[in-house]
């Protein structure tokens, strides 16, 4: 790798960004070397890695969660990544507005414009700007592009530059709701402890903070009255120190018109920094666009409570075992055996020596033979004393994508991981077969515990696999560039968490990736 010659201005800019020179040079090395593929043991399934709960187990989990919420000291929080702009939702409409053809998806929007929750606002914008001509009148007169212009640009609703959080998603008799309002409604149903306060944290782009707070100032009190809850809402932005340097095709830093280095956001994995700074005992993580109207929320609410109950059960067991393993000289062999079984059965964590030599017997027998009891206990404590996450997984009925896998690490241990397609070695026939035959996908439905058995918050950066991530190819002013994406939030950023996968039904996953998704029946449900 050719050494980069930094100018004084470069070093000043790097420092102002909150990044060290060594970190930037490490990023340049990653562009040169790429990222290694993980060693996949198998795709997680019902037999290995994914819990399919029985009716009794679901009932017990619900009872556990209800009991947890009755604890006045419990702090529950919903963490919602919401920094993405809604522009991707309207990609086809942008193309149409700029002169493209009315594709099938565009025509559906024009034909069913009245079915959108934002129609009344759009109609008013059209009438104001077009001398009393409403949206439907303009569409019928062949002026669909005019209507779309009022939808997407500063002339009207500005939806092309707003975040998804502020887009009106669903109709209600009193007034429509945005995506963020649906998260508030949802939180009141499963994340409200006995105190009555629902804590939510949204990550946003800096330019969206003000309109976000403006919306809350208008709507929060009404929602508190509707759901008999008090909302404590906080926000944060992605830290500049998590940005990554951009390079050209030759892997050398590129510069802007003023000769300055170019840094780009490092992807949602950078939000591990934001997650580290929230204080909560239990944290629910869910994407901003996966919400439904109240009449369709029951399955989501029940399974959020179930996942929360499973997490509390796992957390309580882990805390108890950590207490019993504190004194390496006094921990019993039954506790050692129970810990090993707990790690294997709950998190698919196999200890290297046991995994590689099963014929030699269980860990306890090995300890007796090798006289290394204290060393093994330290290993068990290291594996046990980690953040915990319970992740809902949905059966895969379409094309494979990001999903659950059992992975073997360099030290020989195994664990459960969520891998994206870009992390899969598609050139390896066996790995590609496992990818193609995977039965579940990741809907981003997590419940997390980020505190240790003493009640201290973990340093989440200690549990990131920095060898993960990927390189994306972009362009700037028509010139190609390469960008470095940090380990994804629920991928490499949580690689060394203890992970449990639980099957959840498909009706808990209803994301809005395009504006047309809002026309699907689940998002058009009539509210009484």
Task: List each language-model region with its residue ranges.
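N-terminal regions that are enriched for targeting/export leaders
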Residues: 1-47
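Domain-scale recognition of functional cores that engage charged ligands
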Residues: 14, 43-397, 406-417, 422-423, ...
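Short low-complexity stretches enriched in small and charged residues
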Residues: 29-37, 153-159, 239-242, 454-460
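Primarily single-stranded nucleic-acid-binding OB-fold modules
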Residues: 348-389, 398-403, 413-419, 425-528
């Amino acid at each position: 790798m050719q050494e980069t010659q930094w100018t004084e201005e470069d070093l000043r800019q790097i420092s102002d960004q909150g990044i060290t020179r060594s970190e930037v040079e490490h990023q340049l090395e990653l562009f040169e070397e790429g990222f290694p593929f993980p060693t996949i043991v198998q795709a997680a399934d019902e037999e290995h890695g994914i819990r399919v709960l029985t009716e009794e187990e679901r009932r017990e989990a619900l009872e556990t969660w209800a009991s947890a919420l009755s604890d006045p000291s419990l702090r529950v929080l919903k963490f919602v990544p919401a920094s993405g702009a809604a522009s991707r939702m309207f990609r086809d409409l942008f193309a149409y507005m700029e002169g493209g053809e009315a594709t099938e998806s565009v025509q559906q929007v024009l034909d069913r414009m009245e079915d959108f929750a934002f129609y009344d606002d759009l109609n008013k914008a059209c009438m104001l700007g077009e001398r009393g001509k409403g949206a439907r009148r303009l569409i019928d007169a062949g002026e669909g592009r005019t209507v779309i212009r009022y939808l997407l640009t500063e002339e009207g609703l500005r939806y092309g530059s707003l975040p998804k959080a502020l887009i009106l998603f669903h109709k209600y008799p009193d007034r429509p709701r945005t995506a963020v309002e649906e998260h508030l409604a949802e939180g009141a149903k499963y994340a409200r402890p006995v105190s009555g306060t629902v804590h939510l944290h949204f990550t946003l782009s800096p330019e969206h903070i003000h309109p976000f707070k403006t919306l809350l100032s208008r709507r929060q009190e009404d929602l508190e009255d509707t759901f008999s809850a008090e909302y404590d809402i906080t926000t944060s932005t992605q830290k500049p120190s998590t940005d990554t340097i951009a390079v050209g095709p030759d892997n050398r830093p590129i510069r802007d018109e003023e000769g300055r280095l170019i840094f780009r956001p490092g992807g949602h994995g950078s939000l591990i920094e934001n997650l580290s700074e929230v204080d909560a005992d239990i944290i629910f993580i869910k994407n901003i666009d996966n919400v439904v109207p109240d009449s369709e929320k029951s399955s989501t609410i029940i399974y959020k409570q179930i996942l929360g109950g499973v997490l509390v059960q796992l957390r309580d067991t882990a805390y108890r075992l950590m207490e019993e393993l504190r004194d390496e000289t006094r921990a019993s062999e039954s506790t050692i055996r129970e810990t090993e079984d707990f790690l294997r059965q709950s998190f698919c964590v196999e200890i290297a020596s046991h995994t590689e030599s099963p014929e030699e017997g269980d860990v306890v027998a090995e300890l007796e033979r090798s006289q290394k009891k204290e060393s093994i206990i330290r290993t068990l404590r290291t594996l046990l004393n980690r953040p915990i996450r319970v992740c809902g997984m949905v059966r895969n009925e379409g094309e494979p994508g990001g999903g659950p896998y059992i992975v073997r690490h360099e030290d020989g241990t195994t664990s459960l991981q969520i891998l994206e397609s870009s992390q899969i070695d598609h050139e390896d026939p066996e790995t590609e077969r496992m990818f193609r035959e995977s039965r579940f996908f990741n809907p981003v439905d997590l419940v997390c515990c980020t505190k240790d058995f003493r009640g201290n918050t973990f340093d989440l950066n200690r549990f990131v696999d920095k060898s993960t991530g990927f390189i994306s190819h972009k362009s700037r002013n028509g010139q190609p560039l390469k960008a470095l994406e940090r380990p994804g939030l629920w991928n490499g950023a949580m690689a060394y968490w203890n992970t449990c996968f639980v099957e959840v039904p498909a009706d808990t996953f209803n994301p809005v990736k395009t504006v047309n998704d809002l026309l699907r029946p689940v998002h058009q449900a009539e509210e009484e």
